[in-house]
Amino acid sequence: MNQNIGIIIDPLDSLHPEKDSSLAMIWEAMNRGYDVIAFYPENIFLKNGMPSATGILLKKNLKSLIKISERSLWEGSLKELDLLFMRKDPPFDMEYIYLTYFMDALENLGVRCINPGSSLRNVNEKYYISNFPNCIPPTLISSSVVQINKFIAQYKKVVLKPLDGMGGKSIFVINKDDPNRNVILETLLGDKRTIMAQKYLPEIKDGDKRILIINGNPIDFMLKRIPSKDDFRGNLVRGARAKIIGIGNEERRLCEKIRPHIIKHQLMFVGLDVIGNFITEINVTSPTGIREIESAKNINITKILFDEIESS
């Protein structure tokens, strides 16, 4: 009997086959003979204490992966799974947290989850970098207008971002004398919302670096995302340009710094974001970059990932 792999994922027709890391994982699983079932968050439920769902049983015809017929529907208890990937993109809101509770229940039934639900809750992608004060730029996490204004006054130019977002959404660069400062703070803070402020790093003009880490070990190549001329954000969805380069000694040093935490939280797949020599985020929910690196270099990252999963 084939083993079943589940994947909690965004709508399949919203994914780009040539770029999407989740699809790369699905294809690798299929090539290894796994049955792969895709689940949308709204179709997962807990009934009488049993995590269950309706999903889409994906077929081996990879070209038709995005257009699935109703005949491929799957329904049942999630305890039938051997492995579950969580690949739902943020925002990391209460609905996301509820999904991690489902994952907890599954793990109690012996189903392995990547990454584990408890770790997704405990390792907030932005907040968690505060555990490495010597490896990050000057950083403030606060909901206080007073404290944030003091931080802006001290560092003159800062980056402001919510703790629960992704893809460069709602990220602002603000100067000490910016006439829109109050409006930006009102927009971000809302009703005492906690945000992150970081000293602006001019190295972002040369690009930020996404380092993929599998079970604590970095991949030898990293994705450099160079912002467009009219945008400071190093996000491909915001127009940044991709460049694949070899990982350097400084990046390896940063990976070694966070490695014990990765192992402690059983984080099989992580995306580390670096600007200059500073960590800016530790992505654990749905790291991307596989397709860009694989298309440029002779490396099969999903094979490395599944080899590690199957041997650990």
Predicted regions and their residues:
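ATP-dependent carboxylate activation and anion-phosphoryl transfer catalytic cores
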Residues: 3, 15-18, 246-312
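Redox-cofactor binding/interface segments in oxidoreductases and associated redox assembly factors
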Residues: 7, 85-86, 198
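Charge-biased, low-complexity intrinsically disordered regions
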Residues: 9-18, 34, 226-231, 237-238, ...
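Short glycine-rich anion-binding loops that position phosphate/pyrophosphate groups of nucleotides
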Residues: 11, 88-91, 163-165, 287
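Conserved N-proximal alpha/beta basic substrate-recognition cap immediately N-terminal to
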Residues: 13-141
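Anion (oxyanion) recognition and catalysis
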Residues: 30, 107, 152-153, 189, ...
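Rossmann-like NAD(P)H-binding beta-loop-alpha module
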Residues: 134-156
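Phosphate-binding site of ATP-dependent enzymes
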Residues: 146, 153-157, 167-254
